[in-house]
Amino acid sequence: MHNSPLYAAIDLGSNSFHMLVVREVAGALRTVTKVKRKVRLAAGLDPEFRLSRAAMERGWDCLRLFSEQLQDIPSDNIRVVGTATLRLATNVDEFLSEAERVLNHSIEIISGEEEAKTIYEGVSWTSAGEGNRLVIDIGGASTELVIGEHSEAKLLNSLHMGCVTWLNNHFGDGELSEARFQQAIAAAKTVLEKVAEDYRALGWRTCVGASGTVQALQEIMLAQGKSERVTLPKLQELMGQAIACGRLDRLQLEGLAAERLTVFPSGLAILIAIFETLNIESMTLAGGALREGLIYGLLGNNHDCDARDRTADSLISRYQLDKEHAERVRDTAVEAFNQLQPAWRLSKRYGRPILRYAALLHEIGLCIEYKKAPQHAAYIIDNIDMPGFTPAQKKLLSALLFNQRDEFKLDTLEKQGAVTGRQAIRLARILRIALILCMRRTQGTVPSFTLQAEEESLTLTLPKGWMDEHYLRASELRLEVERQQKIGWPTRVQEA
């Protein structure tokens, strides 16, 4: 089997150094290696912005680890960049001289504007969204704010505040109090006010976060049984939980990983300031950021389609799915969704896209075997990289595939976090009916149909005489009616 070439991106961040190694497979990126080491470079800056010898040593030690992985990758396929702390350091040349020797590769110190632009590039490739999108990336020593649409960044700024610098400035002695948080929030608002009006004037439809702070928040939300969308009340609730712990060395929040503890309060304070200053309603986690932007820059790919569409197309190709049949199921499921949306108040923004992808990928489990194909499909989705899909969207997709036939497994639908459990169940009911109507797998064999609903009651109307002429699908529909009625959902099939 011919392997495509490897590509590597290294981000010398203010808090951590990251290395991402990928290869392109079936039109999508497959992660080969991902390494992160906490270097705390920003903590080594003195008042004159000189990097301490100890901080530089931590950086060089990390790069020695990375250098081994780079030996077998063509130099043209590697990009290494330094960000905020290295932009600030007055003795950066001393650090770079040894760092480039260790890596055997040149290192670029990119401007704040280029960093923001590259972050947006990574987000646009790995996260779905229509209309203007606000991207927030809270780094160790800088915070990038970008508004863009599709692949075009329209407004961008790199601000001099980050989770490491705010930790040192406002939580340096480890005290977690209301006063300390308010002090940190107020300081962040002072920085934000210089640019806030431009962002409010341009506006956005969706907001995504591309930093470790937002990753930590989403992990906490899901661990605590909340939806994945970050809101100001949720942030304020977490601030209250942190204050109740009293000190940084006693900080314990359900779902917060140990390696994120130290900089979590400072990142949280900055994010609260951003939410309050820009009047943000909600935010989700981006699929990628700076490193992914560097990789896509190396590849030179275009931005002609939605990130989730690219992922679905790649999976269809990789697992050799019947694309024509998958698209027929998708069209049938979407038609059913559109008919039921007003009565069931289904989410066009959050529910319909995932139903589409469930229809397109419903046969992915067949690559293992038929009998337990729904379980296999769910397992694959749970354990594969899917650029463009948030963790909760992946869980919903997995739950729909798990429930595509046989008995319902309601717990998977109720615990996914992307939409309400009730909506997820209704999406599963739609998918199952669409799959039965498309069983012939041939163009022109899907009947015209009407679906009507009142609360959980569902009626499918087919052309007169259709059931007598299509024995197998009629039998499957009757079995499906029995399954749904057994749970307490009145369901019937009629002809007219």
Which ranges hold each PLM region?
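Conserved beta-strand/loop subsegment of P-loop NTPase cores
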Residues: N77-V80
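Short, non-transmembrane amphipathic alpha-helical segments
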Residues: E469-T491
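Active-site-adjacent helix-turn-beta-strand microarchitecture at beta-sheet edges
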Residues: A141-S142
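Beta-strand initiation motifs
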Residues: G27-V32, E152-K154
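C-terminal amphipathic alpha-helical interaction region
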Residues: E414-K415, T445, T491-A496
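N-terminal basic/disordered segments at the start of proteins
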Residues: H2-R30
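Helical "lid/coupling" subdomains associated with nucleotide-phosphate turnover
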Residues: S4-Y7, V21-E24, R40, G44-I73, ...
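A structural signal for short, well-ordered beta-strand segments
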Residues: V35-V39
